[in-house]
A protein has these predicted regions:
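A residue-level signal for beta-strand positions that form part of recognition/binding surfaces
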Residues: 2, 98, 155
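Short beta-edge/loop segments at beta->alpha junctions of small alpha/beta modules
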Residues: 1-63
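Short coil/loop linkers at secondary-structure junctions
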Residues: 14-15, 72, 181
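Short gly/ser-rich loop at a beta-strand->alpha-helix junction or flexible surface loop bordering the NTP-binding
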Residues: 30-39, 50-111
Length: 195
């Protein structure tokens, strides 16, 4: 479970110096530091469970979500998340791994991510469509439709069967909100595939 310094100080308020108690808990491995002022109590928990807590608001997206949904063949080791209003890429490294956060437009942020459960622990994960759109948002602009297809299926190594099964209505709804060339190309490609 993710817990903040404030919560720990409150829980340990009966101690004369609760900060020393917290330091001892860290040394014993009862608390694992995630970032300044934030800890995890379960050393065996998978890192993706902490991604939303380390920096919020956020949901897991980009390469990690594409891999999670089996859309790309690579296993992604960095926990990649979407956020907004941070104005630059943020990165945190701790004993659970590396966590990166990238901005997407605020108006598209609330669409198409799901609350998933791992045991009884919730986390937020982008849908397949949203993960792809987020990834295309941060990619360098690709002008021609042929080059765009090559980027999707050879560069990203996107699974073509999964691509064909994506919900085109979701993509049509959010793609224009990104205001990026790659998302317009994605809309064009989907229209071409439908014919």
């Amino acid at each position: 479970m993710v817990i903040s310094s404030e919560e720990l100080l409150f829980e340990n308020r009966s101690y004369a110096v609760p900060q020393i108690r917290i330091q001892r808990m860290v040394k014993k491995g009862e608390l694992i530091p995630l970032k300044r002022g934030m800890y995890e109590t379960d050393s065996t928990a998978p890192g993706f469970l902490m991604a939303n807590a380390i920096l919020g608001p956020s949901y897991i997206s980009f390469e990690y979500a594409l891999s999670y949904h089996s859309m790309i063949p690579e296993r992604v080791m960095t926990y990649t998340s979407a956020t907004f209003g941070k104005n630059k890429k943020k990165e945190f490294t701790n004993s659970f791994g590396t966590f990166t956060y990238r901005d997407i437009p605020q108006e598209v942020f609330p669409y198409y991510y799901n609350r998933e459960l791992y045991g009884n622990r919730p986390y937020l994960m982008a849908s397949r469509e949203k993960a792809l759109c987020d990834q295309l948002y941060i990619a360098a602009p690709i002008r021609g439709i042929h080059d765009f297809e090559e980027f999707l299926f050879d560069g990203l190594r996107l699974d073509e069967d999964i691509f064909d099964s994506l919900d085109s209505e979701k993509i049509k709804r959010i793609a224009p909100l990104y205001h990026k060339t790659n998302l317009y190309q994605l809309e064009k490609l989907i229209e071409k595939e439908k014919r």
